[in-house]
């Protein structure tokens, strides 16, 4: 039995194409280990000690890893990775391409990721953030994260110095 063809199929096809490739950003699950090189390139734009493609490939193959990517016009603009254990998760990294920063896209990415974590039974989320990263601190506070501790000398800086990390937690229930 064949399915009837809508008289609007050209429009429906165009709208589906536009949604996938148009300028409107969207968030989608990140599951493909073959995206590891793209993740490594984006990560290198944000961190003094970036992770390599093999590290990302290994993480994406782990069952405990949860990830989402932010896409716009067919290109990955950012991503977030977490590791889930029982009813808790740790955000491992959040990255936006330099061209995507400052427009509220990190809020959208984090909101959708936290919503997904809540749906799969995560009650509490933890993370570490550089104490000097004011935009990230503002973003996390907006999403209910509170400071619970510090780790002195945790992050390596480009100049060889070490920066303090703030440990933060948010309850999703």
Feature map (PLM): residue ranges:
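Acetyl-CoA-dependent GNAT
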Residues: 8, 13-103, 107-120, 169-173
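Residues at secondary-structure transition points
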Residues: 86, 104, 108, 131, ...
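Conserved glycine-rich acetyl-CoA-binding loop
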Residues: 97-111, 118-120, 124-125, 130-138, ...
């Amino acid at each position: 039995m064949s399915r009837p063809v809508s008289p609007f199929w050209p429009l429906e096809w165009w709208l589906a194409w536009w949604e996938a490739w148009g300028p409107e950003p969207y968030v989608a699950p990140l599951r493909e280990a073959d995206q590891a090189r793209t993740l490594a390139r984006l990560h290198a734009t944000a961190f003094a000690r970036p992770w390599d493609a093999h590290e990302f490939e290994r993480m994406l193959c782990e069952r405990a890893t949860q990830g989402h990517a932010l896409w716009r016009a067919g290109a990955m603009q950012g991503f977030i990775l977490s590791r889930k254990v029982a009813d808790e998760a740790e955000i491992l990294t959040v990255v936006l391409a330099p061209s995507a920063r400052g427009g509220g896209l990190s809020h959208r990415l984090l909101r959708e990721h936290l919503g997904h974590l809540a749906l799969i039974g995560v009650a509490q989320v933890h993370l570490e953030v550089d104490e000097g990263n004011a935009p990230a601190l503002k973003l996390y506070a907006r999403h209910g994260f509170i400071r619970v501790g510090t780790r002195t000398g945790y992050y390596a800086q480009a100049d060889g110095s070490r920066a303090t990390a703030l440990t933060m937690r948010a309850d999703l229930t």
